[in-house]
């Protein structure tokens, strides 16, 4: 994959430039655009992934299915499809916004900061996974309610963005509705 950049955002969440992805994620990460996607299979199970140990931020933690950064002149939906193919080797359908105005700032144990405007989507996986081990070290299909119980019991085992997204009652209800259709 070619070098990725993040789209930097100003105080009004408007694009203000780009920065190479790894250079952007530091102790003083600037506000930038991202996305988060929760994938469900045909049985309504959620794909939970464990981030590779080579990841700069939150290596080895469990998280929602796929996250990433739209590139300049790329829609969020196009970026989600691209990252699903790259990280999970999977095709998706029924891409649906579930928490369009999510944003957060969090610092990992190594001091790396995430500072993102990060719309959240749900989608349906339509092919068999072919996981990229440089991105994902483990994965599991689980019932959404079981994942929610785990998030409540052991939030430290999951990415902070996943915990925050699922903690929003409206987003959680939308995800639950999505997995049941």
Swiss-Prot record:
Q: How does it assemble?
A: Homodimer.
One matching Pfam family = NUDIX
The record ties this protein, via Gene3D superfamilies, to: Nucleoside Triphosphate Pyrophosphohydrolase
**Is this entry keyworded Nucleotide-binding?**
no
What are the protein's UniProt keywords? Cytoplasm, Isomerase, Isoprene biosynthesis, Magnesium, Manganese, Metal-binding
**Entry's PROSITE patterns?**
NUDIX
According to its UniProt entry, one GO biological process term is: dimethylallyl diphosphate biosynthetic process
In which domain of life is the source organism classified?
A: Bacteria
EC assignment: the record states 5.3.3.2
Organism of provenance: Salmonella paratyphi B (strain ATCC BAA-1250 / SPB7)
Pathway involvement of the protein, from the record = Isoprenoid biosynthesis; dimethylallyl diphosphate biosynthesis; dimethylallyl diphosphate from isopentenyl diphosphate: step 1/1
> Where does the UniProt annotation locate this protein?
Cytoplasm
Q: Which part of the chain is the Nudix hydrolase domain?
A: 30-164
Sum up the protein's function in the record's words.
Answer: Catalyzes the 1,3-allylic rearrangement of the homoallylic substrate isopentenyl (IPP) to its highly electrophilic allylic isomer, dimethylallyl diphosphate (DMAPP).
Q: Describe how the cofactor binds.
A: Binds 1 Mg(2+) ion per subunit. The magnesium ion binds only when substrate is bound.
Catalytic residues, chain numbering:
67, 116
Quick check: keyword Isomerase in the entry?
yes
**What is stated as this protein's family in its record?**
Belongs to the IPP isomerase type 1 family.
Q: Which InterPro entries match?
A: Idi_bact, IsopentenylPP_isomerase_typ1, NUDIX_hydrolase-like_dom_sf, NUDIX_hydrolase_dom
- In Swiss-Prot or TrEMBL terms, this protein is called Isopentenyl-diphosphate Delta-isomerase
- Which molecular-function annotations from GO does this UniProt entry contain? isopentenyl-diphosphate delta-isomerase activity; metal ion binding
> Looking at the UniProt record for this protein, which Gene Ontology cellular component terms does it annotate, in alphabetical order?
cytoplasm
- Kindly list the positions annotated as binding Mn(2+): 25, 32, 69, 114, 116
User: Catalyses which reaction?
Assistant: isopentenyl diphosphate = dimethylallyl diphosphate
Chain residues that bind Mg(2+): 87
């Amino acid at each position: 994959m070619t070098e990725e950049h993040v789209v930097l955002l100003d105080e009004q969440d408007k694009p203000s430039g780009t920065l190479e992805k790894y250079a952007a994620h530091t102790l003083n990460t600037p506000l930038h655009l991202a996305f988060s996607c929760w994938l469900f299979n045909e049985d309504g199970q959620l794909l939970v992934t464990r981030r590779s140990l080579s990841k700069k931020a939150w290596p080895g933690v469990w998280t929602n299915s796929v996250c990433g950064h739209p590139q300049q002149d790329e829609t969020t939906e196009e970026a989600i499809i691209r990252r699903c193919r790259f990280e999970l080797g999977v095709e998706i359908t029924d891409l649906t916004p579930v928490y369009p105005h999510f944003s957060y700032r969090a610092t990992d144990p190594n001091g790396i900061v995430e500072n993102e405007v990060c719309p959240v989507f749900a989608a349906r996986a339509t092919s068999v996974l072919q996981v990229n081990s440089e991105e994902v070290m483990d994965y599991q299909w689980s019932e959404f309610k079981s994942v929610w119980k785990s998030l409540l019991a052991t939030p430290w085992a999951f990415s902070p963005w996943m915990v925050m997204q699922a903690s929003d009652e409206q987003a959680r209800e939308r995800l639950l509705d999505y997995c049941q259709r």
